[in-house]
C-alpha cells in the first residue's frame, strides 16, 4: 500500500489510496494465497506447548466448509455472526467464513462475563455464534433472552449436546470445500467491534470491508515499512480487539506473512520473551500494558535469542521511559501509533523514516488527514490545544454506530471525526497527546494530562505501574492523585509517598506532582488493557 520512500515527506507526497469498488476481506487475506503451494499462514501454540501449522490452502478449504455450513443453517448476507474464541485457527476460520458469506463478524472477548455478553449479543442481534465448551457455559443461561441467536457452533470434543448447538468439526465434515464468495463492495458491512465502554454503554462500531485496506498504511509505517524483513508476526492482543485483528492478523495475511497464535490465560513477560525467541518472531505489536509487565524481566537480550526487527505499540501512551527500555531490552525502537476502534492507525512513528520526538505520538499516516480542531470542527493552528480529529471520508473510518444514529452524529463536528482525545500539533506535523477529554485534570487553572506524570512515576525503581486521575478539591478544583502498583520488595509507606512526590516535582513541574498517592495491588483495566480511570476517580 505504501510506496517506497526514503523519508516521510517523500512518502506523504507520493501516497494515493487504491481502494477497489469490489473487495472482500476473506478473499484478499486467504484465497489469493491458497494456490496449492502450501504457503504457511499460522503457527498455533497451545498452553500445553503443542504446536500446529496451518497453510493458506488449509484456511481456504476449512473456511469454505464453514461458510457452506452457515449458509445451510440459514445465515445470509448482513446477518451477524458472533465469534467468542481466543487466538487460534478456528477463530480465524470463523472470521474468513463470515466475510466470504457477506455476513458481519462480531468478535467477543473470552474474558467477558454474562452481562457484557448479553448486551453485545442482544444489541447486534447475532444469529449465530462460534465458541468452545467454556464459552458456551456462559452463553447457555442467556439463550432464552436472545431470540435472534438461532445456532451455536461449539469447538472441541467436549461440545455440549443441546438444542441449537452444532459440533464444529462434525458440521464442517459434511460440507464441500468449494464455496463462491459473496461479491461484496468495499463499502459493504463486514465487522462490528464494540468500544470499551469507558464512557457509557459500549457502542458497536460497524466497519466495511475497506477497513482492512484503510489499516495498511498505518501497519506498514508502524512496523518499519512492513512487510520488509517480516517472517512471523505476533501480538498478545486478543483478536477480538481491533488491535489484534486489524493491526496484526488481517494485515499480515494481506501481505502473505505468517502469524503466531498463542493464548495466555494471564499475560506473563517471561513467557512472552521465551515465545518470541522460540518461534523467531520478527514483528510484534505489544500494547503498553504488556511492555510494562515485560520490563520486569531481567536481561532479556542476554537470555533470549530474539529475532525482532520491529515492535509497535498503541492503545495507551507509551512514554519516554518505556521507549528507552525497549531500545535496550528489545534491540529495536518501539514505534508508537494512535487510533481507536472507530478510526484506527491514523498517527504513527517510524524510526526508519524519522526520529521520534519526546512526548509525541508521531505524525499523520499517509492517507489520513489528522488535525487539531475546536468543538465546531474548525482546525486550530500549531501549538494550540484542541481535539484530535480525522477528516472524512477515510477508508479506515467506521460506517456508523450500530443502530445508534444519535451517537454517530455526536461523533462528528463538521467534516471531522472527533476522537474524544485532546492534543496539539507542531509545525513539523508531530502530534502530542494530552489526554482523553474526561481524563484531563484541571488544577489551580492548569490543564494537566495524566500521561507525563505516569511516565515519570515509572522511572522510579519502586513503581511497576501507575495511573493518574484528578479528584475534586475545594481550593484547586482538582488535585492530581496517583494510584501505584509497586515492584516486589518495596513498601507503600509515608516515606515512599514523599519520595515519589519529590521524584515528580523535581522532574516535571510543581503543579503536576501527585498531592495524593494510593498504593494498590492492581489497576482496573478494560479487556483491551486500557486503564479505566473513571473507576479510579470513583474509588
Task: List each model region and its residues.
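Conserved ATP/PPi-binding loop(s) of AMP-dependent carboxylate-activating enzymes
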Residues: 364-367, 378-410, 448
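AMP-binding/adenylate-forming catalytic core of the ANL superfamily
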Residues: 115-119, 127-132, 284, 392-394, ...
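Conserved AMP-binding/adenylation subdomain of ANL enzymes
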Residues: 213-235, 240-282, 297
